Curated annotation (Swiss-Prot):
This is Iron-sulfur cluster insertion protein ErpA. Its cofactor is iron-sulfur cluster. Binds 1 iron-sulfur cluster per subunit. PANTHER family: IRON-SULFUR CLUSTER ASSEMBLY 2 HOMOLOG, MITOCHONDRIAL. The keyword Cell inner membrane does not apply. Keywords: Iron, Iron-sulfur, Metal-binding. One of its GO terms (cellular component) is cytosol.
Amino acid sequence: MADLAVPLTFTDAAANKVKTLISEEENTELKLRVYITGGGCSGFQYGFTFDEKTNDGDLIVENSGVKLVVDPMSLQYLVGGTVDYTEGLEGSRFIVNNPNASTTCGCGSSFSI
């Protein structure tokens, strides 16, 4: 049986930051959840939250012992994308590099398909 490709990449930088945040919270059950909501200046926006549970149908991507969780509705907009963590002049944040987005806003937090 062939291995199935993971439809979303969870970078080492993002996983390491999640690991640090989980350690600070002292709750090993936490997982980073990425989701899509309507809104933002381009129609859809990315959201990130910590969640202790997973739901039926959630995709779980593991890296360095930490988990990224995505619900099925959000996943359809994120397939082929990458969840990363960056630190720069604008501050530090989790970002999504999404090949499905036809346009993105200047700050990168919203997009359209």
